[in-house]
From Swiss-Prot:
Family to which the UniProt record says this protein belongs: Belongs to the ATPase gamma chain family.
Superkingdom of origin organism: Bacteria
Function of the molecule: Produces ATP from ADP in the presence of a proton gradient across the membrane. The gamma chain is believed to be important in regulating ATPase activity and the flow of protons through the CF(0) complex.
Keywords assigned: ATP synthesis, CF(1), Hydrogen ion transport, Ion transport, Membrane, Thylakoid, Transport
Membrane topology: Peripheral membrane protein
Subunit structure: F-type ATPases have 2 components, CF(1) - the catalytic core - and CF(0) - the membrane proton channel. CF(1) has five subunits: alpha(3), beta(3), gamma(1), delta(1), epsilon(1). CF(0) has three main subunits: a, b and c.
Gene field: atpG
Keyword Acetylation applies: no
Lineage: Bacteria, Bacillati, Cyanobacteriota, Cyanophyceae, Oscillatoriophycideae
Subcellular location per the Swiss-Prot or TrEMBL entry: Cellular thylakoid membrane
Name recorded for this polypeptide: ATP synthase gamma chain
GO terms, molecular function: ATP binding; proton-transporting ATP synthase activity, rotational mechanism
Organism: Rippkaea orientalis (strain PCC 8801 / RF-1)
Amino acid sequence: MPNLKAIRDRIQSVKNTKKITEAMRLVAAAKVRRAQEQVIATRPFADALANVLYNLLNRLQYGDVSLPLLQQRQVKTVALVVVSGDRGLCGGYNTYVIRRAEQRQKELEAQGINYRLITIGRKATQYFSRRQAPIEKTYVGLNQIPTADEAGSIADELLSLFLSETVDRVELIYTRFVSLISSRPVVQTLLPLTVQGLEVEDDEVFRLITRDGKLRVERETIAQEVSSFPQDMIFEQDPIQILDALLPLYINNQLLRGLQEAAASELAARMTAMSNASDNAGQLIGTLTLSYNKARQAAITQQLMEVVAGANAL
């Protein structure tokens, strides 16, 4: 017969665990909102910067433009910037982005191209360190909601590697946010820049809302308007000098957007994982409660049978 006290203790333990997972789900949900607000707050600057660069490059694309960040050279070494999380308890978030990085490594090796890793996040750093992969630089302990200063320091390192010709291309591997239950690891080329790479596309904004007592995601496509410069516009400075000053800002902004997307994906994955854990805990509590009631009923029945048997013996 099952021990009633052991079952009661386990029910209480599962209830305590459920309280923890539910609290973690709510915290992750609040941080997803903050991540979204940060993306929206940085959008006006990002849109204006992309618009200026787009028009300048189109104005100069038939001229003699020679800028280091636009230089296309033979690719011998690629820097792979892998963005992961510092912690677990977020489902397969870290596993998927690491798997995509390994897939990209194999693709480069098949082409005879060397690679160097720049890991952002403790999970990717630990994984590739154990496998003695060629890690150039590591960044751990960043804010859960990325800041412009953090993105700027990483961007400076990437620019230094590219301009010194230590690497010939820089690729960012991060997790793009799709929905609360879906994300997609992607590879984006940061350097060198091309005119096509600066083309402005419609962007999607996700908003976390509450409907019928449940958290949901609303997606909105925002068409970004591109205004053209007048053909007779006169620049006080040489347009090439303007480009040379703005391109590093654009790289910084692109990296920040990637880090923000990755942070939102991690938080959404953690929220989903904790929600599933809470649901599983509820089901386990129900199963244990049923077992407890059956065991208690069996114990009472056994006691009644013993009383009746004793009375009959008299």
